[in-house]
Amino acid sequence: MRLLRAASSLARLHRPGHSTLQQVLISCRSCSNGITPNERIRNIGISAHIDSGKTTLTERVLYYTGRIAEMHEVRGKDGVGAIMDSMELERQRGITIQSAATYTMWKNHNINIIDTPGHVDFTIEVERSLRVLDGAVLVLCAVGGVQCQTVTVNRQMKRYSVPFLTFINKLDRLGANPNRALQQLRTKLNQNAAFVNIPIGLEGNLRGIIDLIEERSIVFDGPFGESVRYEDIPPEMRSEAADRRQELVECVANADETLGEMFLEERVPTVLDLKAAVRRATVKRSFSPVLVGSALKNKGVQPLLDAVLEYLPNPTEVQNYAILNEEGESEGSKILMDSTRDDTQPFVGLAFKLEAGRFGQLTYVRVYQGCLRKTDYIHNSRTGRRVRVQRLVRLHADQMEDVEVAYAGDICALFGIDCASGDTFTARNNANLSMESIHVPEPVISMAIRPSNKNDTDKLSKGISRFTREDPTFRVHFDTESKETIISGMGELHLEIYSQRMEREYSCPCVMGKPKVAFRETLTSAVPFEYTHKKQSGGSGQYGKVIGVLEPLDSENYTKVEFSDETVGTNIPKQFVPAVEKGFRDACEKGPLIGHKISGVRFVLEDGAHHMVDSNEISFIRAGEGAVKQALEKATVVILEPVMSVEIVAPNEFQGAVIAGVNRRHGVISGQDGADGYFTLYADIPLNDMFGYATELRSCTEGKGEYTMEYSRYQPCAASVQEDLVNKHLEATGQLPAKKSKWKN
């Protein structure tokens, strides 16, 4: 009945493309019955740098496939806002904050789409999406080309082996240059890429596109470009189209053995040969097809949808593994998931995102094997808990459709399930399986937060509790020295958004403190230790002795803390080794210089001693802590600071002022680019020096400059900066540095 009501209301709303709507409803019904074969399913994400047009593109996709009745613009200029930006803050700011999931039909294929944020502060949303998707569309701006966050998204897609198409958007913008964007795709991202279609005209003269494989031009008619018309290639563009097609064949031949043989034998590939070769190379991630268009002007979206079906993999063409954790084994073995869409195999699914909805906690799940039915009992591999599926839904932004069953390859959501992001759910008879976890970056910035009204403390703790469950990059702790609640995240915007959500969703206005950088402390060289913890107070006492080395890790592992047990024999019984490790990790929570965490170190336990009566777990915890403190007293300790990769775009006349500003902030310029009266500056700048840069850049470029930044690495800070940080810490904790007191006297 619910589906019939949805169908009748959607039919009343929908005006253009009635046949498409009918197809959607019939197909949605077949999806919920689980009979759509794998070959007709695509799980894709749309990712890019901020303001490349991802959400606008998704809006067009939903309109052309009959999923929505009318289109709206991203910033809510028409008072509505994009369907996929369902959060009020998203419509107000014109940015995507959370990943939004939807599904639609195109040419009898079911496409699950996740629209992801472009802002680096919300990078965990992109990580989650790519982990569970089979393919992706990387959107590039025809003016900006490959930008800061594009590089990050490319790295994330490589981490999860996600094949992707590239869509060069915004060809209608002044200064659009798709050739430069393609060149940057090859040089900056090291991708084997080539045009699959090219534009007819640019900027205000964009009339259509040329399909290089089918060798025809495509024109988009109608008020919203919904009518696609095919014509011959215009005579003035035949030469360029032939050259670009030859370039496409050569690039694919380098990546595909079958087409490579045809190329060497000088045989002309047919349209089907070329499409099959492009698909094989794309699925292997050895080639990326490049499509062009303008989502805002409704051009090039339908060919992109065709390319998603033709070139991106279905769930059977992607190998997904679960880890089988056998008892007594430190490392689990990998098990290949069976993506057959039936109930012959036991269910395995991954909870990749949590969201608090109107009806309770919503858990997004990707089904990797078997099927999940409403009322089924499933097991959480991490906690061992058994939970019942009370309600199973498919999502369209913030709207839902109830379904009875979800099969392998489907993305669905569950209600009322208590879990954390990254948990694996399994059927009862394979509860020791777990999917590979999602990579969670470390927070780089912290702020103190408190409610404006002291009576709202409960609301604050309730909101923070929910946000930390939803977002693994959002952390919170209570500072016992300053008696403040400290929240940590990926950037100022990240924490600012949560502060605003606290006010909107919990009626709890908050006051934020000044941003604090997440410094770290580390050693410069290895230091041996030999520490004995001994305590005797009548009766059984405490005794534990540890011998070993505290050594620094290489610069790539500055954020890690490692423990290595190299003991031989029973001087330290094996049951006490975890206690030594706990003591070591506890001691690393607070460094000796400025009280920040110690990282980039390895604790190597080589030997020790125990007492038959007095040795216990607490003894070796204290011994581990004491060993770290002893080693740090003898070591040279340095402060590590997060360094950001910054990309600045501004008019050429302000180049000198911008470079001077970067130098003042201890930045190191790594490269420069320029086109159409604008220059792009690439630099590595310490995060501690980036506060207030937005205001400075606007001031020195008359409001015409903009910048983006993302976390790059940790590195030792300059000696003068370290001295300044240590002095500030000593002043804040009530200790005056000896140097300053002498100077005052």
Curated annotation (Swiss-Prot):
Keywords: Elongation factor, GTP-binding, Hydrolase, Mitochondrion, Nucleotide-binding, Protein biosynthesis, Transit peptide
Residues at which GTP binds: 48-55, 115-119, 169-172
Keyword Nucleotide-binding: yes
Entry EC number(s): 3.6.5.-
Reaction(s) catalysed by this chain's protein: GTP + H2O = GDP + phosphate + H(+)
Biological pathway: Protein biosynthesis; polypeptide chain elongation
Residue span(s) of domain tr-type G: 39-316
PROSITE patterns recorded: G_TR_1 (PS00301), G_TR_2 (PS51722)
Transit peptide: 1-30
MF terms (GO), sorted A to Z: GTP binding; GTPase activity; translation elongation factor activity
Gene3D superfamilies associated with the record: 3.30.230.10, 3.30.70.240, Elongation Factor G (Translational Gtpase), domain 3, P-loop containing nucleotide triphosphate hydrolases, Translation factors
GO cellular component entries: mitochondrion
Broad enzyme group: hydrolase
Subcellular location: Mitochondrion
InterPro entries associated with the record: EFG_II (IPR041095), EFG_III (IPR009022), EFG_III/V (IPR035647), EFG_IV (IPR047872), EFG_V (IPR035649), EFG_V-like (IPR000640), EFTu-like_2 (IPR004161), G_TR_CS (IPR031157)
Main location: mitochondrion
Keyword Iron-sulfur: no
A biological process from GO: mitochondrial translational elongation
The protein's role, per its UniProt record: Mitochondrial GTPase that catalyzes the GTP-dependent ribosomal translocation step during translation elongation. During this step, the ribosome changes from the pre-translocational (PRE) to the post-translocational (POST) state as the newly formed A-site-bound peptidyl-tRNA and P-site-bound deacylated tRNA move to the P and E sites, respectively. Catalyzes the coordinated movement of the two tRNA molecules, the mRNA and conformational changes in the ribosome. Does not mediate the disassembly of ribosomes from messenger RNA at the termination of mitochondrial protein biosynthesis.
Family: Belongs to the TRAFAC class translation factor GTPase superfamily. Classic translation factor GTPase family. EF-G/EF-2 subfamily.
Protein name: Elongation factor G, mitochondrial
Taxonomic lineage of the native organism: Eukaryota, Metazoa, Chordata, Craniata, Vertebrata
